[in-house]
Amino acid sequence: QTIGVLTCWLSCFFGMFNSLYTLYWPLPVSYDRVPLWGSIFFMVGAAVIMVNVLLFTFNLFSTVLSKSNPRSYTFWQFLRAAFGIPRLMKLFGKEDTAAVNLDYNGLPVFIVAVGRGSIDTVINAIVLLTAGVLILVYGLAALFQAPLDPGAVDALIYKNWFWWGLDMVADGNVLMYTAGVWYLLIPMLVGRKLFGESVVRTVIMADLLISMGVWSHHLLGERVQPLFMRLLSGQFITWGEFFTMGLTIFAALMTIWLARPVKLTPPLKFILGSIFGFIIGGMTGLVQANVGLNLVTHNTQWVPGPHFHVLLLIGVGMLVAAVIYALIPMLTKIEIRTPWLVNLHFWGWLVGGVVMAYGMGMAGSRGMLRRTLYETTLYQPYMAVAMVGALLMAVGFLAFLVNIVATLGLMNVLSLFMPEKWLAGRQAPAEA
């Protein structure tokens, strides 16, 4: 994975590969503007990443479904029972005789959510791998003086294929993996079973079906995309995700509510911040997933600001912090050393993220495009506000690093990244 990422990064930094992030056809194979060698190395790196992702997901599924596991399941038993199909069949008077009783002997909701997210991850990896191989074939053909015709590939079909796969990153990696960690950590932290666990399994299945048909919200600004696709996939089916994610958030919050009184520990506090980030980022996504409103917000700073920066930085970022704050005491029996640094991290990151998103969103609503350099001062006040928010986040992150190093010890932290022989004799046990 590291080799693939570095190969992609180096091909852009030194190889000057400059196709847009979306890799819209035929830009990646327009070698009059895209460096040939940079393109080839970028696609090789991307292929390495995608193959590694496929190996990762294979390892996950093979671990859960391993025949050496006394609680082993076939693949279809896993899907049927984990997603609650036997319960649905009972509603219609049918009995699934081959069903596995996951209520007592099987998979926790966390594993079900990870399995569900991994399905999207596999789809994403396959789609991006095929898109990358296609570009690589064109690059190698050009390298050997036998250029292929870019017109042989329909640009609109390519866009739909590309975004169908790429959107699975948001659905599988961001939404479902996040939900799975909520399902795991919240019951552990508050000492109560997850609220509505049986319903949650069905919600996970429903979101799997919905996620297959939402990719067109990335193409609402494409005039050549058929209107019925923009309305059906880009708007109405996309709105279905707000029901599934809303039910997920409701189950998480109700679990905390019914466990009162609860101690607002650092991990629980950051989980609440994560939920807040998904609420804000999800609502701005709802605004964008509208054929009419997207005419105003498409490709503006509104998209990266209050939408996916909030989802990733606040929603996912604070969840990662929650996991770290929860696991360190669990695994090392050492409490986080400085509580006030935890609070500084929390408020600096949360307030900074909201302020940054607000500045970018206000600029976007006034027409500031993303990926565009402005020489005028028209949008500078909004970007100044966004910069203040980013600096607050930096302060919060610095507080986090200082606290973790102080808790575990500098040499113990360095040992995670450096060979042990370099640190021989210098490591000391962390103080409890």
Task: Spell out what each predicted region is.
Residues 260-263:
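Soluble secreted/lumenal catalytic domains
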Residues 26-30:
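Intrinsically disordered, low-complexity, charge-biased terminal/linker regions in eukaryotic proteins
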Residues 100-114:
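Cytosolic juxtamembrane amphipathic/interface segments immediately preceding
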Residues 222-227, 294-298, 371-372:
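Membrane-interface helix termini and inter-helical loops of multi-pass transporters
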Residues 1-24, 36-65, 79-99, 115-149, ...:
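Hydrophobic cores of alpha-helical transmembrane segments in multi-pass integral membrane proteins
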Residues 155-156:
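A cross-kingdom feature marking solvent-exposed beta-strand/loop segments within repeated
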